[in-house]
Each structure stands twice: as structure tokens, then as C-alpha cells.
Design a protein with these regions (language model features):
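Thiol-based oxidoreductase modules, predominantly thioredoxin-like and allied folds used
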Residues: 58-67, 77
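Typically the conserved alpha-helix immediately C-terminal to a functionally engaged Cys/Sec
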Residues: 46-49
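Boundary at the C-terminal end of the N-terminal hydrophobic targeting segment
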Residues: 23-25
Length: 156
């Protein structure tokens, strides 16, 4: 019984597949839904920040109050847009890196919030804000409404 021989074509095909698979996987974008007011510029800028960081947003331009209530995010953590990603609620100008960390760690929680609209957070940043950055916190919101600090961003 002789050992199977590998043709040049099979070796080449296997090599190309091993290169193509990681490239294809790296291009996979994580989908989320975003509810916002159709005229909100900072919401559009936050979505652009997410899309630059590997997310694909489906935008619902009908405001976010009803979505926030339906998804269980307490009003006191409210902001100008609400998102849903892999079962987590994202409220406000949460940085993409914190959402990526949330999806990696998968804590038992409702989601994340950056209450209000702090200057310097994604979507509230850049030259139109004189590159100012106020201190703010990203909160991990539990289903019972309790919170812990997920990340802190200092004044800059």
C-alpha cells in the first residue's frame, strides 16, 4: 500500500484556503440595530465611529424613547440613541472598544450606557467641539437597574 501523494494543485488550494479564511473572517462585521432621531448629527458620527471599528449598523430613524423602554434600559441612563447588539442594549456614546470588550467577556447584564452626551465621547468629539474631552464613565447596567463602572475616560 503506497502513501497518498499530494498534487501540486491540492497543495496550492490548501495554501490559498488557509490564507483566505482568516481574511474572510477578519472582514466579518458585527451587526447592530440603532434607534435615533433622523436629524441627530452626533448619532450619525457615533455610528460612523462604530463602522470604522468593525460594526455594521442598521439604523431606525424613529427616535429612541420607545426602543429604550421596550428593551428595558432605565430612562435615567438615557441618551440620544439606543442600540441592540447580540442581546445587549447600548445607550448613548459608548466607545467601540467597550462594546467589543462587552461582546468578548459576555457578562450577565442588560448592557452599557454613557448617560447624557459627554463632550469627547465618540460622536461628540473632534474639531466641532474644539477637541475638548470631558471625563465620563461607561456603565455596565444590570437587569435590575444597578450599575458598575465598566470603563472610565479622564478629562483630556
Amino acid at each position: 500500500m503506497s502513501a497518498p501523494t499530494l498534487s501540486r494543485r491540492r497543495v496550492l488550494t490548501a495554501g490559498l484556503a488557509s490564507i483566505a479564511l482568516p481574511v474572510w473572517a477578519a472582514n466579518e462585521r458585527t451587526s447592530l440595530q440603532v434607534w435615533k432621531d433622523p436629524n441627530c448629527g452626533c448619532c450619525k458620527d457615533w455610528i460612523a465611529h462604530l463602522e470604522k471599528n468593525g460594526f455594521a449598523a442598521t439604523v431606525i430613524d424613529q427616535g429612541n424613547n420607545a426602543a429604550r423602554a421596550r428593551l428595558g434600559m432605565p430612562q435615567k441612563f438615557g441618551s440620544c440613541h439606543t442600540a441592540l447588539i447580540q442581546g445587549y442594549v447600548i445607550e448613548g456614546h459608548v466607545p467601540a472598544a467597550d462594546i467589543q470588550r462587552l461582546l468578548k467577556e459576555k457578562p450577565k447584564a442588560l448592557g452599557l450606557s454613557v448617560p447624557g452626551m459627554p463632550v469627547g465621547s465618540p460622536g461628540m468629539d473632534g474639531p466641532s467641539y474644539d477637541n475638548r474631552r470631558d471625563a465620563y464613565q461607561v456603565l455596565l447596567i444590570q437587569r435590575d437597574g444597578s450599575t458598575t463602572v465598566f470603563n472610565t475616560y479622564p478629562r483630556g
